[in-house]
Amino acid sequence: GRYSEIPREMLESGDFVTPHLNYVAYFEKPVLHYWLTALSFEVLGQNEFAARFFPAVLAMAGVFVVYWLADRMYGPRAAFLSAWILATSLVYFAIGQINITDMPLSFFMTLSSAGFWMGYRRDRRYFVLFYLGMALGLLTKGLVGVVLPAGVAFWWIVLTRKWEVVREALYLPGLALFFLVGTPWFVLVCMKNPDFFDFFFIQEHFLRYTTKMHGRFEPWWWFIPIIIVGSIPWTGFLPGAIASALPSSIASRTRQDRGKIFLLLWFGIIFLFFSISNSKLIPYIVPVMPPLAILMGSFLDLNMDRGKTRSLGM
C-alpha cells in the first residue's frame, strides 16, 4: 500500500521532506508515519514485518500508557484490567497490525491526554507530554492530533470549573517543545511546495470533513456498531461502565468524579467529532478505545470490590 511505497521512495530518492507516491508529490498525510516506516525499512529490510513494525510497537506502547494512567487514577488492579481490555479488544488488536496512520495517531493522542491528566494531578512537568503528544499527532495526521486532545482538556476545564489549570497547562517548556517538534517540517514542505498549504489544510482538512468529496459518507450513528463490535470480547461491560460514570460525574465535583468526566469527554469528543464528519472509515474510531478501556477496567475493579463480578459475567 501507499504507506509502504512512500517510505520506500523516500529511501530511494533521499528526499525526506516531500512525500512521493509513484514518484508524484503526495500531500494527503504529514510525514512522521513515513519517516518511521522508512527507518524500519532501513533497519529491518523492506518487508511486511518491517512495514507493520511501528504500528504494532505503538499499539503496545498505548497499552502501557493506559496502564500507567489507570494506575494513577484508580490503582494497580484497575490498571491491569484496563490495559488487558485495550490489548485484547478486537478493533485495537486488529488495527495495531496494519500499516496505517490511525494507530500511531491513537498512541500520540493517548500520550497527550495522559500527560494532561498527570500534569493536573501530579506534577506540572507532565504537561510536556501533553504538548509532545499533540506535536507528534500533528505530524502523523494533521490538525486532528491537536484539536481533539486540546478539546478534551478545554471542555474538562469548563465543566469542572478548574480555571487554575489553564495557567498551569500553559507550560512554557511544553509549548516550546510543541513548536520545535511540530512545525519545522510544515515550514520546509511549504517552502518546497507552494501548493501544499491549500491542498493539505483546505482540501484534506476542511473539505474532507465538511463535504462528501471522498465518497466516504456514512450516517451519524455509523460508529456505534463499530464500537460495539470493536470492543469484543468486552462489549457486555460497555453499557455498565458508561452508565456508572455518568450519574456521579454530573452530581458532584469530587476528585474521582473529575476523573470520570475526563474519561467521558475523552471518549465523547472523539466519538462526536468523527460521527459528525462527512468522511468515515473504521480505523478512525480507534482513539476512543483507550478511554473506554479505562472506564471498563475501573468499572470491573469497583464491582470486584463490591462482590458483583458473578453478575457481571466473570
Please place each PLM-identified region on the residue numbering.
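Membrane-integral, polyisoprenol-dependent glycosyltransferases
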Residues: 1-310
